[in-house]
């Protein structure tokens, strides 16, 4: 389903796969300002300070910034307004908070989230998993693609499957050590194996409902020095 949205943005939504897409989230000038600012932020490797087991050792470790929050999330880092170009993103989400809250089945006052910038170079991806929170479940997740351009053969697609896992991890599963308590699932847990994908189109916001089984396809060698650049985070 596709509907019109203010400021030339469009919304696509799938109940079957649990996603919402908002294209053209920011104006061209605002996206460029945010891109320039975020690229100058400080990045570090995922798992530099604590082990997030969703990041399998063979999938590569993305680079990310420190977190920023909208609302009281209990997370460290600045909270909106941050007096930086990150506020362009926060404000754009705030303008569409009614549609987002409705999709996540929340009241508008319940929409709180934490966000960080992520960089994936060629060869880096993220294995199949569902997002789970610390001590409490996430209310949803999102990714906003911030790179200037992206070609179809460069990989980095968001892959989504219906939740068709019926078997527990076997004791001899190579992924068992990384799967326990993390939301990480090996391909052997997927029975039907039919899903959908979303291209990392620039200026596109993708929102996922909780318990959506998904992965990030590794960025292809054809991308060269072009990195998959996004803002991503969780509704809490």
Kindly label every feature range from the protein language model.
Residues 2-101, 157:
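Non-heme Fe(II)/2-oxoglutarate
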Residues 101-236:
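Catalytic core of non-heme Fe(II) oxygenases with the double-stranded beta-helix
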């Amino acid at each position: 389903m596709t509907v019109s949205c203010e400021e030339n943005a469009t919304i696509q939504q799938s109940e079957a796969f649990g996603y919402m897409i908002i294209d053209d989230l920011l104006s061209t000038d605002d996206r460029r300002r945010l891109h320039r600012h975020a690229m100058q932020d400080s990045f570090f490797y995922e798992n530099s300070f604590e082990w997030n087991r969703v990041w399998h050792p063979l999938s590569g470790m993305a680079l990310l910034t420190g977190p920023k929050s909208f609302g009281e999330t209990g997370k460290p880092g600045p909270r909106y307004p941050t007096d930086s170009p990150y506020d362009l993103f926060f404000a754009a989400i705030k303008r569409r908070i009614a549609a987002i809250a409705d999709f996540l089945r929340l009241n508008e006052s319940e929409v709180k989230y934490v966000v960080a910038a992520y960089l994936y170079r060629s060869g880096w991806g993220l294995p199949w998993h569902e997002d789970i929170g610390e001590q409490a479940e996430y209310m949803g997740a999102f990714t906003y693609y911030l790179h200037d351009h992206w070609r179809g053969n460069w990989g980095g697609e968001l892959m989504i499957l219906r939740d068709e896992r019926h078997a527990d991890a076997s004791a001899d599963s190579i992924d068992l050590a990384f799967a326990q308590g993390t939301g990480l699932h090996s391909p052997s847990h997927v029975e039907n194996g039919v899903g959908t994908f979303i291209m990392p189109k620039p200026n596109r916001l993708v929102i996922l409902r909780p318990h959506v089984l998904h992965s990030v396809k590794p960025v292809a060698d054809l991308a060269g020095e072009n990195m998959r650049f996004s803002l991503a985070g969780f509704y809490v």
